[in-house]
């Protein structure tokens, strides 16, 4: 479906903005006379806005149309990245990143919600996995290009590139809205924003919804709190330059792409519980290996394992998120994203303090222990949920 391909490009742009700053932390710290932990405020601010503005973006998407909302936030995000490129100080860069995160944050959740409206549940997980190919490529290319551009032209260069990318993506989304009836028809009935807010607040009363939201919050805190410092770890402890350390993170996206390419066969073979168990195992091994890696060559398969494991676990959570409230799917998936990026914000803040005092390895080890335990707990709860549904 062409509409999904364009949404995948929007997801690419979203991921590019999300992860492009990671390899630039050493350059930002040097440019603004601060530590890597201090420079990581640009990551935290983006994640905070990305998460907290979901409570607005989701209901608006339900009201005005999810695909149309993705177009508008993509167009506005181009201006946000331009503001980042011209920021004269770290506080203003943090403010510009916060503003950009507020709009970029709506892209993936509303795109997922639109897919939830358009694709039946039994076919949804492979479609979501293919949609996320754009997201994974965005991570891979943004960290690689950002690091290389940063070394050659300075940290501002990547934001000009991102601005151009968002302009192009917005143009393609607008074309789809004008020419593809599916972008206007495949959505739940539009309801008042206030009703969508009330429905979002009421979701937390469901026991299974609370499990999904709590799990994704902890996942975001442990996984992305540690991943934000993977490029810095490669630069500081593995002896790589800024460009090479950014390119190294592409291995993470490579692992995710492997999952996306085999998801159609893997999902029916392993089932949801098998995906969760395998995902937790890959993540634990990946972070433990990264903490102990003696060199970059050893770190590459560790990052690939992280990508494979993360998308096995997270894709399962995403599918359940699209079913939390089918009648108000934009608000429901936005609440899911709110919890994910609230967790990431907390994780990056906690990790930044640990990195400045104890280095990156303790952060990776905590993630290596905590995430497999989280996966085991969710697997157990998933089995109990299936039994509850089976017995009515």
Q: What are these model-derived regions, one by one?
A:
Residues 273-317:
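C-terminal transmembrane helical hairpin of 12-TM major facilitator-type secondary transporters
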Residues 53-65, 259-271, 355-356:
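Helix-to-loop junctions at the C-terminal end of transmembrane segments
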Residues 178-212:
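Juxtamembrane intracellular "pre-TM" segments in multi-pass secondary transporters
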Residues 33, 65, 86-92, 103, ...:
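Helix-breaking motifs and short loop linkers at transmembrane-helix boundaries and internal kinks
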